[in-house]
Design a protein with these regions (language model features):
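A compositional/biophysical signature of low hydrophobicity enriched in polar/charged and small residues
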Residues: 1-258
Length: 258
């Protein structure tokens, strides 16, 4: 695992649908070299696959997040799990109402102990007019999150530009997203999450390293990447300079179930 491999992984972590041509340009290697390296990362089990994340808004649901300090495993209807070195595990929960989410967190707490952190993003509205084609695009991408636009268009018998435009809108409005599943231990990279109430300042500091974020105007959780622990420590120190109360968790495993 060298610096080129790490840059490839970073590109995939930031955008699970990024094209190999774009990765090659970003990293500064040929398409042939990139293809060889990606195939090796897959065969070595570093790149494990890709997951399509679908916003709960599409099902009329709400979500909340809670972190527990426990080494026990809990799989009671969660939307994602991120396990951290500090024996803290962050879970995502979804429900039809906020009361349902709170009850799911309480149920987890009865097994794992009281949560050390909870975050409930404010309920938002879908900011685009969805149609049946959008639902069909999502259906196909559940089976293959990186399916090329040309293949989606062919399967749905729709114009290429129509599919490209609708897919870009779904991604832009964060109604869907594609997450690369990376073996963090084998990949020798660091992913860490930061929960902060100084979210605007922290977001600005961490923008170059941010993979994705769940936030509103007052607080948020940012998931960030570093090529090594030294870089992660430096970024965390900068965060502490603007928010001494920020919660930091270094991830060693993550799973998405939506």
């Amino acid at each position: 695992m060298d610096q080129v491999d790490k840059k490839i992984l970073f590109n995939l972590l930031r955008d699970g649908r990024i094209s190999q041509r774009q990765i090659a340009q970003n990293v500064g290697i040929s398409a042939q070299t990139l293809g060889y390296r990606i195939n090796r990362l897959i065969s070595d089990g570093i790149i494990k696959g890709y997951s399509l994340i679908v916003s709960p808004l599409l099902d009329g649901q709400v979500e909340g997040f809670a972190a527990f300090k426990s080494d026990r495993q809990y799989n009671g209807g969660v939307s994602f799990i991120t396990r951290c070195l500090e024996e803290i595990t962050l879970y995502g929960f979804r429900g039809d109402r906020m009361e349902d989410v709170e009850e799911k967190i309480a149920a987890a707490g009865r097994e794992l102990g009281d949560p050390v952190m909870k975050y409930f993003p404010p309920t938002a509205q879908v900011e685009m007019n969805l149609n049946s084609n959008d639902m069909e695009i999502i259906r196909l991408m559940r089976g293959d999150p990186r399916m090329p636009v040309t293949d989606i268009a062919a399967k749905l018998d729709l114009p290429y530009m129509t599919v490209k435009r609708r897919l870009n809108l779904l991604l832009k409005n964060r109604l869907i997203g594609v997450v690369s599943q990376i073996d963090l231990s084998g990949g020798d990279v660091v992913i860490y999450s930061i929960f902060s109430h100084a979210v605007d300042a922290v977001t600005k500091l961490l923008e170059p390293q941010t993979i994705f974020a769940i936030r509103d105007s007052t607080a948020g959780v940012l998931f960030c990447y570093s090529e090594n622990l030294k870089g992660a420590r430096e970024s965390i120190s900068r965060v502490r300079s603007v928010d001494s109360d920020a919660d930091v968790m270094v991830l060693y495993e993550y799973q998405f179930f939506t």
